[in-house]
Design a protein with these regions (language model features):
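Short, surface-exposed acidic/glycine-rich loop or hinge patches that mediate macromolecular interfaces
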Residues: 9-13, 42, 60
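A structural signal for isolated positions on well-ordered beta-strands in alpha/beta enzyme cores
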Residues: 5, 34-36, 88, 121
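FMN-binding flavodoxin-like domain, especially the glycine-rich phosphate-binding loop
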Residues: 29, 50-173
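N-terminal beta1-alpha1 ligand-phosphate binding loop
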Residues: 3-25
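Short acidic/polar alpha-helix capping motifs at helix-coil junctions
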Residues: 8, 38-41, 73-76
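A short beta-strand-loop structural module common to alpha/beta enzyme folds
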Residues: 31-44
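Residue-level signal for beta-strand positions within conserved beta-sheet cores that form or flank
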Residues: 2, 31-33, 83
């Protein structure tokens, strides 16, 4: 049975709620896939390294800051050899209040994962957003799913519902 490590960090609970939706949808689409929902707080590299399929959820705080638990996890993350591992990212941000830093956190971590041999999946269009800049953006695409529940919460479920089947297909699951 395939398993996915779904790691997230949260301070307000918003990223956790999205992670729970992601897990629920995966299990609805592919009941034979085990999804382990894991908060990143006080985790070690080995907790993440055991998975071949990873979905990582991160909010971006203020002026492009990483959520505290993800900031602390950087040394652990840098110790992981992602060769052969498949990763997809989702991020939460505010495209208006912090337009110059929209969903930067997933860009920072996606770059590290790719530089450490990981394969990224789940790129999404950046064209339906009104931000100025994002470290998560490459040309007209984000390196994952960017969600703005502050300003576009009405689009969140539809975006997740479109993204998850694409990620599972891209993962080969």
């Amino acid at each position: 049975m395939a398993s996915i490590g779904l790691f997230y960090g949260t301070d307000t609970g918003n990223t956790e709620q999205v992670a729970e939706k992601v897990k629920s949808l995966i299990q609805e689409i592919k009941p034979d896939i085990r999804v382990d929902l894991i908060e990143i707080y006080q985790r070690k590299a080995a907790d993440m390294a055991q998975y071949d399929f990873l979905i990582i959820g991160q909010p971006t705080w203020y002026d492009g800051e990483l959520q505290g638990d993800w900031e602390e996890f950087i040394p652990e993350f840098e110790a992981i050899d992602f060769t052969g591992k498949q990763l997809a990212f989702f991020g939460l941000g505010d495209q208006y209040g912090y337009a110059a830093y929209f969903c930067d956190a997933i860009g920072v971590y996606a770059d590290m994962a790719e530089n450490q041999g990981g394969t990224l999946h789940g790129f999404t269009s950046a064209l339906d957003y009104e931000h100025d800049f994002s470290k998560a953006q490459r040309a007209d695409q984000f390196v994952g799913l960017c969600l703005d529940i502050d300003n576009q919460d009405d689009l969140t479920d539809a975006r997740i519902n479109q993204w998850i089947p694409e990620v599972l297909t891209s993962f080969g699951l």
